[in-house]
Amino acid sequence: MSHVVVKNDPELDQQLANLDLNSEKQSGGASTASKGRYIPPHLRNREASKGFHDKDSSGWSCSKDKDAYSSFGSRDSRGKSGYFSERGSGSRGRFDDRGRSDYDGIGNRDRPGFGRFERSGHSRWCDKSDEDDWSKPLPPSERLEQELFSGGNTGINFEKYDDIPVEATGSNCPPHIENFSDIDMGEIIMGNIELTRYTRPTPVQKHAIPIIKGKRDLMACAQTGSGKTAAFLLPILSQIYTDGPGEALKAVKENGRYGRRKQYPISLVLAPTRELAVQIYEEARKFSYRSRVRPCVVYGGADIGQQIRDLERGCHLLVATPGRLVDMMERGKIGLDFCKYLVLDEADRMLDMGFEPQIRRIVEQDTMPPKGVRHTMMFSATFPKEIQMLARDFLDEYIFLAVGRVGSTSENITQKVVWVEDLDKRSFLLDLLGATGRDSLTLVFVETKKGADSLEDFLYHEGYACTSIHGDRSQRDREEALHQFRSGKSPILVATAVAARGLDISNVRHVINFDLPSDIEEYVHRIGRTGRVGNLGLATSFFNEKNMNITKDLLDLLVEAKQEVPSWLENMAYEHHYKGGSRGRSKRFSGGFGARDYRQSSGSSSSGFGASRGSSSRSGGSGYGNSRGFGGGGYGGFYNSDGYGGNYNSQGVDWWGN
């Protein structure tokens, strides 16, 4: 092998210098384009290679003059991913709650739960929203508008609300409004009110909105279906839009610097059930459309991991059940340090379900601002004495608002009570369903979970499209059942009491108490699922010997609501009263305390607002045993009854008087 000495050749030296990765200055500054870059063999000695390693030309450049990448997947100077949008993920993989598209600046589709938030984990908080005007609406989204506002009905009987009496007690009560335009709630709220097709406020909204806008605490007692949810959401969101995020935004930013993802909601709404929490959340989505406010909902029975991921995208208004909220707080995911607005919806129901320890833990034993600093509202259809005493601890110089017949039922609901033995209930139910038509939404209440499954199976084999919900069903199954019912695919829903409170299912035409509850207040909430927000409705209850304990209360309720009272029920109530059966009467009818502000009672036994009427003047008759008068004692002869059953006859008028 021969060794040949090669003379120094300038071109060869240049190539060797280019192969030296550790020498950025080999070319003596004459060829700054190379900067020690390796040149692929197919580009060596070509003129086209001169611009290939230009530091300004492409992503191959690794110049230290830039502290962030500029290509797909790059990082900007603030350490945030260029691929991940700084605005956070959207709602349900379509558009987010404020109308932004799923596509970020580089055309990448947003995938829920796929990290489309910055490293600190709270996208909507950590943008430049502190510099933005929260009162200005964001751009509209036609697709999101269709999703949020496509349904709804204000009701054909809305005018009747003008005559409902209202009683407000408390110092310096703000004057009520007659129209939404009478009070300044901002451009965003007024636009969303128009989209929801609300023409004018209901009585509870007329009084509650100016009270909350005036930053006064409130305890409101209104009939079910009267628009309580909008009564507190509208003024709370209006105030948030006006005031902005305040200190909560800084707290989230500061917290995020250390890798934590704790959220500090500005408003908290507590609800007793998962269904009611989801319903309030959906309403909050409507009224926060085109705003920078992001509502969230957390409840038990669902994947907590998914709920945490949703929270980490930002949370300004939180709707929660008490148990799941305590869990989130103990995990360090929720802080209430900057909560300005607290709402307890269906407060009596939460106490009935045993949530008082959790509520006090949330309100009194954590970091929530004390009363007088935060603004607190309590809403429910009934307010017994225990709830009003709880208000002393949570509310500061509050206003008590009683709308209509407190704890009573709406006159928009036609109530029918029929005597049906247990063995005849299924046959009578089939007759009712046949009379009301297969397209009408019908809600059937039973007392037990087993009874719900059994009745659903019976109706299915009779050819009826039906579904059911109760406490043993998974959250997913319950939500699917409610969706099938709302959409009309399964127009018959069999339910236990889990669905009785707070559910806002539009256009329920008929509520049937297949099994009457033992508590008259539960009866009030059950039949309140129909006749909502001015719509007309019908409630039919099957009564027999097992329901003797609510005879007197049921009679008083029918009289209050100006309903037709069967003569046999009057006779039963009279006899039951004089046998001492009134000992089991509910708190609602024990002097009517839940109907008025306890601060005004001063120990008096006054019956108060909407108190029950006595029945001492009822006819003694011949005793209820011989006065059922339904032909054969069962449902068979009931069609010819003068007082009630005539509307069942297919040859006469229907249930609705047509």
UniProtKB/Swiss-Prot annotation:
- GO MF term (any one): ATP binding
Which keywords does UniProt give here? Acetylation, ATP-binding, Cytoplasm, DNA-binding, Helicase, Hydrolase, Isopeptide bond, Methylation, Nucleotide-binding, Nucleus, Phosphoprotein, RNA-binding, Ubl conjugation
Give all Phosphoserine modified positions.
Answer: S81, S85, S89, S101, S129, S181, S454, S590, S601
Residues of the region (Disordered) are 1-141, 597-625
Q: Where is this motif: DEAD box?
A: 345-348
Task: Give the modified residues of type Phosphotyrosine.
Answer: Y103
Q: What is its main location?
A: cytoplasm
Where in or outside the cell?
A: Cytoplasm; Nucleus
Modified residue N6-acetyllysine is at which positions? K55
What positions does the entry give for ATP binding?
198-205, 222-229
Which of the residues bear the PTM Omega-N-methylarginine?
R100, R109, R588, R613, R628
Q: From the record, which residues define motif Q motif?
A: 178-206
Q: Where is the composition biased (Basic and acidic residues)?
A: 1-10, 44-68, 93-128
Q: What is its EC number?
A: 3.6.4.13
Quaternary structure annotation from Swiss-Prot or TrEMBL: May interact with TDRD3.
Name by which UniProt lists this protein: ATP-dependent RNA helicase DDX3Y
Organism placement in taxonomy: Eukaryota, Metazoa, Chordata, Craniata, Vertebrata
